[in-house]
């Protein structure tokens, strides 16, 4: 794994406190990916940019009835610290879970 000091806390947190995986690590960027339930894909792309800040692209996608995922949300956030990145990762997991639960509830309502 090729990473530097910019990702130490993030990697530790993801590995020990989430069900997400770290893919494609580089010296200035990492990609964090995981499924939430069967139908939600959560990806957080993190790159160290100017002044050592973190640019985070959060991609939350839904897989409906076909085999392809459709992006539902894709905000870009720039934060200053690893702790802020960790908060964004937690928020993306929470939003993904809410999306999954909402879709399941709507599907259930339609089937009743």
Predicted regions and their residues:
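A generic alpha-helix structural signal
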Residues: 11, 89-90
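Intrinsically disordered, low-complexity regulatory segments enriched in Ser/Thr/Pro
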Residues: 38-88
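Negatively charged, low-complexity tracts enriched in Asp/Glu with abundant Ser/Thr
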Residues: 1-39, 68-73, 99-112
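Charged, terminal alpha-helix-loop-beta segments
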Residues: 81, 90-101
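Terminal export signals
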Residues: 88-89, 106
